[in-house]
Curated annotation (Swiss-Prot):
This is Tachykinin-like peptide-VII. The keyword Secreted applies. The modification Pyrrolidone carboxylic acid is found at residue 1. The modification Phenylalanine amide is found at residue 10. It comes from Phoneutria nigriventer. It comes from the Eukaryota. Expressed by the venom gland. Keywords: Amidation, Pyrrolidone carboxylic acid, Secreted.
Length: 10
């Protein structure tokens, strides 16, 4: 999911 990818930045 795109959201999960974004969370990876954190």
């Amino acid at each position: 999911q795109k959201k999960d990818r974004f969370l990876g930045l954190f």
